[in-house]
Amino acid sequence: MHVQAYGAALGYLADTLLGDPGRGHPVAAFGRGAAALERRLWHDHRAWGALHTVACAGGAAALGGLWQAAVRSAGRGARSTDVLGQAVVAWSVLGGTGLAREARAVAAALEAGDLDLARERLPRLCGRDPHRLDAEGVARAVVESVAENTSDAVVGALVWGALAGVPGLAGFRAVNTLDAMVGHRSPRHRRFGWAAARLDDAAGLPGSRLTAALAVLAGPDPRGALRAWRADAGRHPSPNAGPVEAAFAGALGVRLGGTLSYAGRTEHRPVLNAPGRAVRRTDIERAVRLSRRVGLLALAVTGVAGAAGRAVARGGSAGHGRGERNERKAGRGRDEQGGRRGGTGPGERSGPQSGPGPGRGRGARSERRRGFGGGHGRGESGW
């Protein structure tokens, strides 16, 4: 196992036991900074939105790199310090426990028959207009949000942490937050948020596919999950939410999608897993449990994959080093052979010769040939 795997495991454990950091949450601080920069940069143009996205996401990744370097410097390269630094960032980025807590709070309000309270808490999970939703609509919105945020707030972060360490964690969370802030089709953000939405689609792709695959493996109905994923994922307007929501719908045996309302706008989305039944309040808890299983499996998969990738990289580096050493040894061997050939042979005269006899002439010609041949040989051998 390597630093990223240990750090991710400790961060996941901290999120499970402690939940979100609370006051001074880095993601909330990033959101305030991104909103302030948006007020200064906003123009109804894609280029300005791209500048905003690069500045915010790139800045977050750079800060993550600085944090990682500072922790390593403070710990003088100690592995335990590096793991702790990774764990702190993973804890602040992962949101599985907060997601489960908010989903269960809505479920508790529905169980108590308090639809108004359930509607009041729903915006903490998603951007739907809650006042147009009945109890079934609220429950469906929660299940869809649990599915999508399992990918965004848990699995995707673990994937990028395994790939790029602290900069990957910070950068992915920044991209995901920007998409939630500006990556939608409101009049203000239709053009300005285009870059954030496209970057989020690209960054979220590996995590969403892994989430869907793990939902198939961990869900109560693997065949139904796989069937819904194959049949309905491409019908969803989001390339990443589609596979995840479809797989969750099939795994839980419920219908998702349909008519939605966002900020006064009504959207009619295709139904996911049409053979399933309508969502009930009790399906919220089932979705949360599936989300937790998927998160644990993702932690294991990314940890093993990261360790394997590091081992392969080390093996390739070691093999390259061995190849260089072998070539140097071979070169020295060729040089030594050339030197032996260049010495005095048994049929040659070692002392000074008197007169231009036949032996003297053969020796001179032979020395000239050996001198040219030996030098040329050393040049070709790379010395």
Predicted stretch roles:
Residues 1-383:
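Short amphipathic, positively biased membrane-proximal segments
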